[in-house]
Design a protein with these regions (language model features):
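Non-heme di-metal
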Residues: 1-180
Length: 180
């Protein structure tokens, strides 16, 4: 049987969207419960949010042949999704909001569209890095930091294994000092 184009595929997308939305809502509810002094209720919302995340993951995997796609595929999909959001979706939402007199919401839609454009650019650059084998190697010396223990080193490539905590190269990134 072919899942693509079936009512079951539509149901999987609906289930994925519903579980994803529930997860976010319950996370927001947990935050509010904490602020209002209800730690137990917050913990139950958080637990349920994590359950919903796993339900969404299960449906997402079914939609993708039983597994999460590769990082390259995910970066491509993410970039394409962000492109749609900033070029079509939020642009249309802003126009409608403006026509209906919701000027402040139109401005928010446009503001988020600008952020989505940045997201697309970031994903496309990361995709270039993966395809060009430039995630852990760069032209010229860079300052690398281990995301696990904070070890810092300088070189064209991150170490294969952190000499301090023994975590693999996957834990390294180019150090960014954005607080200076």
């Amino acid at each position: 049987m072919e899942l693509k184009g079936s009512k079951t595929e539509q149901n999987l997308w609906t289930a994925f969207a519903g579980e994803s939305q529930a997860r976010n809502k319950y996370t927001y509810f947990a935050s509010k419960a904490k602020k209002e002094g209800y730690e137990q209720i917050a913990a139950i919302f958080e637990e349920t949010a994590n359950n919903e995340k796993e339900h969404a993951k299960m449906w997402f995997k079914e939609l993708n042949g039983g597994e999460i796609p590769s990082t390259v595929e995910n970066l491509e999909a993410a970039a394409d999704g962000e492109n749609y959001e900033w070029t079509d979706m939020y642009d249309e939402f802003a126009k409608v909001a403006e026509e209906e007199g919701f000027k402040a919401l139109a401005a928010k839609f446009r503001g988020v569209a600008a952020i989505e454009k940045e997201h697309e650019e970031r994903y496309r650059k990361l995709l270039e890095n993966v395809k060009g084998d430039l995630v852990f190697s760069k032209d010229g010396d860079k300052v690398w930091i281990c995301r696990n223990c904070g070890h810092v080193c300088i070189g064209k490539s991150a170490p294969k294994v952190c000499p301090v905590c023994a975590h693999p190269q996957a834990y390294f990134e180019v150090k960014a000092d954005n607080y200076m």
